A protein has these predicted regions:
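Catalytic pocket-lining loop regions of alpha/beta-barrel enzymes
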Residues: 128-129, 142-247
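Active-site gating/metal-coordination segments in enzymes
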Residues: 76-77, 83-170, 177
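Hydrophobic/aromatic residues located in beta-strands of well-ordered beta-sheets
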Residues: 9, 78, 100-102, 162, ...
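Short, acidic/polar
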Residues: 59-69, 110-122, 205
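A structural motif corresponding to the C-terminal end of an alpha-helix
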Residues: 68-76, 96, 157-158, 189-193
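Active-site environment of divalent metal-dependent phosphoester hydrolases
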Residues: 17-19, 85-88, 109-110, 137-138, ...
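Mid-to-C-terminal alpha-helical segments outside catalytic/metal-binding sites
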Residues: 1-12, 19-72, 77, 242-247, ...
Length: 289
C-alpha cells in the first residue's frame, strides 16, 4: 500500500504560471458573488486554500519553469486549459508538445459558437478533453441543462471526455447546478459520453460511487483536493471495484503546491495495484495517449 516512488504521472489538472491570466479567468465569476469578502478574494475559494503557491517573478520562461516542477515529481504529461486570457498555452504547445495535452474550457451559454470554438481548437492543439464549471458560468448552467447537452454531443462527436465540476463549489455561489444526482440523466442519455467528475462531488461522494458502478463511462478525478482530504468512499471504491475509474488530478498552481500534494499522497491508503492505474494508466487509456 506504499506510494510507488519514481512512478510516472499524468496530471489531469495542471495550470501554467500566468498570474494575470488566472486572475482574469477568476474575474468572470465575480458577478455571481453577493458577499463582500468573496469580491475581495484574489482566488475564488481563498477561504479554503491558505497556502496558494507564489507564481510571481518567475523570470522570462514561466513555461520552462513549470516543466522543471513537473520533472521534480515525475509528471510525464499534464492536462492544461487553453486559457483565453493567456498566451502561455501557445508556448507550451510550440516548445513542449511532448509534455502538455490540452482541454478547452467551455461556457455552455455560448451555444453553437462554443461548439465551433471547440472544433477549431481541436485542430490547433492536441485537445484531449473539454471542461465545464457549471456553478461558475454566468448564468449558471446545471449539469443536465439543455445548454450542456449541446456540449456533450460535441464531445461525443469528437470522441473526447468532458471534465465537469461536481458537488458543492468552493466559491460562494449556489450549488444546485453541480448536484451529483444530475449526472445520472446525462450518462443515461449519452451512453457514449466519457464524463469525468472534478472537484470532489462532496457531500454526495457515495452517490458518485453508485453512479460509477452503474455507468461504465463515468469517472472521478481528484482535482482541487489535498490528498489527506480524499473522500473515504472514493479511496474504498478505488481499492475494491473502482480501480479503473479513479484518476489523479492536482491543483497546481491554482490552490495547492506540488510539494504538498506529493508529500500527502504517500499517506493515501491505496492498494499496491491501484497506484499505477491512479497515477498514470487510467488517464493514458481515457485520453488515448
Amino acid at each position: 500500500m506504499s506510494y510507488p516512488e519514481g512512478h510516472k504521472v499524468i496530471d489531469l489538472m495542471f495550470g501554467l504560471p500566468d498570474i494575470k491570466g488566472l486572475h482574469a479567468a477568476y474575474e468572470t465569476f465575480k458577478p455571481l458573488y453577493r458577499d463582500r469578502e468573496s469580491k475581495d478574494f484574489a482566488f475564488p475559494a481563498q477561504y479554503m486554500f491558505k497556502d496558494i503557491p507564489n507564481i510571481e517573478d518567475l523570470g522570462d520562461d514561466p513555461v520552462g519553469w513549470a516543466v522543471k516542477q513537473m520533472d521534480r515529481f515525475n509528471i510525464e504529461k499534464a492536462l492544461i486549459g487553453v486559457n483565453v486570457f493567456s498566451e502561455l498555452h501557445k508556448v507550451a504547445r510550440d516548445r513542449f508538445a511532448d509534455r502538455f495535452i490540452f482541454d478547452v474550457p467551455l461556457d455552455p451559454n455560448g451555444g453553437m459558437e462554443e461548439v465551433r470554438r471547440l472544433r477549431r481548437l481541436a485542430k490547433e492543439y492536441d485537445v484531449r478533453g473539454a471542461t465545464v464549471f457549471p456553478c461558475g458560468c454566468n448564468p449558471q448552467v446545471p449539469i443536465n441543462d439543455k445548454r450542456m447537452y449541446v456540449m456533450y454531443a460535441a464531445c461525443v462527436d469528437l470522441d473526447i471526455p468532458i471534465f465537469v465540476n461536481a458537488g458543492v463549489p468552493g466559491p460562494r455561489v449556489p450549488m444546485f447546478p453541480q448536484h451529483v444526482e444530475l449526472i445520472d440523466e446525462v450518462c443515461w442519455f449519452f451512453p457514449e459520453l466519457k464524463f469525468v467528475m472534478r472537484h470532489g462531488a462532496e457531500p454526495w461522494e457515495a452517490l458518485a460511487v453508485k453512479l460509477m458502478l452503474k455507468y461504465p463511462n463515468l469517472y472521478y478525478s481528484t482535482s482541487a483536493f489535498a490528498p489527506k482530504h480524499y473522500p473515504k468512499a472514493i479511496i474504498n471504491y478505488a481499492n475494491t471495484r473502482g480501480a479503473d475509474k479513479i484518476l489523479y488530478a492536482g491543483y497546481f498552481p491554482m490552490g495547492l503546491s506540488l510539494d504538498r500534494i506529493f508529500t500527502e499522497l504517500r499517506d493515501v491508503p491505496f492498494k499496491d495495484g491501484v497506484w499505477p492505474k491512479f497515477l498514470y494508466e487510467n488517464a493514458r487509456k481515457l485520453l488515448k495517449l
